[in-house]
Amino acid sequence: MKKLFGLLSVVLVAVICFAQPVDAAKKEKRAKYVFYFIGDGMGINQVNGTEMYLAERAGKIGVEPLNFTTFPVRNFVTTYSAYNSVTCSAAAGTALATGEKTKNGTIAMDKEHKAPVYSIATKAKELGMKVGIATNNSIDHATPACFYAHQPDRNMTYEIATDLPKAGFDFYAGAGFVKPEKKDSVNIYTLFDRAGYTIARGNDDFRKKAAKADKIIFMQEQGCDMGSLPYAIDRKPGDLSLEEITQGAIDFLSKDKKNGFFVMIECGLIDWACHSNDAAAMFNEVIDFQKSIQKAIDFYKQHPDETLIVVTADHETGNFALGTGKYELNLKALQHQMVSKGQLSKKISALRTTHHYAVTWEDVKKLLSDNLGLWTKEELKESYEKDLRHRYDKAFSNGEQEMVKSLYAEDEPLANTAVQILNRIARISWGSGGHSAGYVPLFVLGVGAENFNGKLDNTDIPRQIEALMRDIQ
C-alpha cells in the first residue's frame, strides 16, 4: 500500500511539474498579428457555390475547396441588427467592428444614437499595435467606416471621411472617397494632409512612398472610379486589386513589428455583384478574395504562434439559391461570361451610340455570344431567344430606355435579361436584390482559433478577437 501511495505521489508531482510549463506556454500565446477578412454579402451559398463552380470547371461533381474553407474552425453566424431581422451593412459592420448591435444605417454608434461605440481597431491602437483598414469599395463605405468613424447615417460620407484622421490609424486603402468636399467645409484631403497622412494613388505610387511614410492612404489612380475598384471579372492590366492592397497593408504595417498589427480587409464587391444578381461576377469576386487571404496565410506560415486569421461576412445578399427544381446544376456555364453585367450594359449602350440605333439582331447576337457564350457555348431555348429578341426590339427602337436599377447599378434591360438567362442555364436563382437574414460563414486559423467554435452571433467575433489581442506588449 505504501509503495502504491509512493508511486501515485511521484506521478502526481510529475503531472504538476509538466503541466505548469504547458499552461505558461498557452498564456504566452497572444494574437500579435490579426487579419480580419469580411466578405460583404458572402453567405454560405456564395461560398459553397463558388467551390462547386470551381469543381465543375475542373470536370467533376462536388467542391474544389477555397483556401479559407480548409481552416480548422468552420462555423456559422447570426446577423440580425438591433431592430431588424435583416441587417444592413452599417449595422452589421458595427456589430463586427465593435461587438454591439445597432440600428440599421448607423455607423458605430449605439442604437439610440446617443454615444459612439468603439471598434477593435481602436482597441488595437490603444494596445500599441499598428492598424490598417482596407476595402475594394470606397474607404468611406459602410463596412470600413464602422472601424474608424461614428455617424448616425451611413450616407454622411463627408462626415465619415472627416473621422478618419481622428481615429489616427496607420494604413487606409480602397478606391477613394465619394464626397471629398462639402459646402463651407474643409476638403478632406486638406484634413488628411494636416494629420500627417501621405496620399498614394496606384500601386506604383504606393511602393515609392510607403517606405518613408508614417501614415498612408492608398487609393486608385486619379481619374478612376472613387466608389469601387473594378470587378475581378473586368480587371485590366494596371488596375489596382484587393490582393495588391493586402500585400501593401502587410508590408506597411510590418515595418515596425514590436507590438504587431491589426488589419481589416473587406471584399465589398461580392455584395455589389449579388445586389445585381450577377452570379459569374460574384463567383469571380470570391475566387479573387482568396488571393488576398492567401497573403495572410503566407504571413501566418512565418509567424504561426502569433497570427490569427478570421474570415467571415456581414450578411448574405440576394437570397442566392443553388438549384431551380431539377436535381442538377450547370454552374460551368458561367465560365463563358467574360464581363460583369455592368460592363455588358456599357457595351450595349456603346453599340447603340456608335450605330445610331441602326443595330441588327446579328450584331446583338455576336455581342452576347462573345461576352456570355450564348448560342456558341450554350444552346438557348426558343423562349429564351424570344425574350432576348423582345429586349432587342425595345433597346434599339428610338424610344427612351428605362434602365434596370439595383442598389449600386443601373443596367440596360437587354443586359439584365441576358445575364438572367445565363443564370437560368446554370440552374441558380436569386430571391431578391437585397439582403437576407441567412447565416453567414466563419473560418478561423491561428492563435486561439478554438475559441470560435459553437454557434455564434456576429457580436461575439470582435469580442473574442479583442480577448486574444490583449497583453501582447
Please identify what each model-predicted range represents.
Residues A31-Y33, M42-V47, M52-T94, P144-A145, ...:
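A post-motif C-terminal structural segment
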Residues V13, Q46-T50, E100, T106, ...:
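Residue-level recognition of conserved structural "scaffold" positions that shape functional pockets
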